[in-house]
């Protein structure tokens, strides 16, 4: 009886072989697709984590309306669980690129820091003097290297005073870990959109205080893991408390300087 059933099964398969191959292919495709979906997230998280670690990406960005000082950075860096705290300067400003017909456009100018949020050089070289810069590779072409970038006169006085020079030479092109998306953000300037980022050495800015402090945690935990979330959640209230304390000290300092003037 079983032998006859086996023969019938074999005969059925042979007579409809194409159909069985199609069913097998559909099942194999479904299994492959499901396996791909299951591995996609871990693979993407791993790739992102490795990229951010390679470029020393920050964990917290601290802001204060009165600015932040080097003493503030040291105070945050002294907290247990903090690996590094670095002051930085950034500003949105209108600029024009010499030798092009782009006109004035808005860019986000960033301080080039060797120890945190380091860009990926894609063409040219890093700035070697205070009047050189790195330009967003998604905005410019390699042929733009060597051209002058002019700070537009239409910027307000405070913005223009933030720059040590009125023009900078494009030394290279780069990607930035601060701008992982294609869009570069919004601004109150120009059309309302940031067209690109521009990295300038610290000496290329004229500043008395930092506009932000970047903090990295002393942990090897990968992003999107429970261990990382726990470390970040534990650190956030401590940073917030220290920021409130430092802001009060900064306010008292500014008021004291105003009274002595």
Task: For the regions a language model picked out, list residue spans one by one.
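Membrane transport/envelope proteins' first extracytoplasmic loop
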Residues: 2-261
């Amino acid at each position: 009886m079983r032998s006859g059933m086996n023969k019938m099964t074999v005969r059925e398969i042979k007579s409809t072989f194409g159909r069985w191959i199609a069913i097998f292919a559909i099942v194999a495709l479904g299994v492959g697709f499901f396996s791909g979906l299951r591995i996609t997230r871990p693979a993407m998280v791993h790739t992102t984590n490795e990229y951010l670690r390679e470029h020393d990406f920050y964990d917290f960005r601290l802001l204060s309306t009165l600015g932040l000082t080097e003493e503030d950075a040291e105070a945050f860096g002294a907290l247990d669980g903090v690996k590094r705290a670095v002051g930085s300067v950034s500003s949105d400003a209108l600029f024009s690129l010499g030798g092009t017909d782009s006109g004035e456009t808005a860019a986000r100018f960033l301080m080039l820091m060797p120890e945190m949020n380091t860009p990926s050089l894609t063409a040219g070289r890093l700035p070697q003097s205070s009047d050189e810069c790195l330009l967003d590779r998604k905005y410019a072409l390699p042929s733009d290297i060597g051209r002058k970038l002019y700070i537009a006169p239409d910027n307000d006085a405070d913005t223009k005073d933030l720059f040590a020079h009125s023009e900078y030479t494009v030394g290279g092109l780069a990607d930035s870990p601060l701008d992982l998306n294609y869009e570069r953000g919004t601004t109150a300037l120009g059309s309302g959109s940031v067209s690109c980022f521009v990295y300038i050495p610290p000496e290329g800015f004229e500043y008395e205080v930092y506009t932000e402090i970047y903090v990295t945690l002393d942990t090897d935990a990968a992003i999107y893991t429970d261990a990382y979330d726990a470390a970040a959640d534990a650190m956030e209230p401590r940073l917030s408390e220290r920021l409130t304390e430092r802001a009060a000290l900064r306010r008292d300092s500014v008021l004291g300087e105003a009274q002595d003037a």
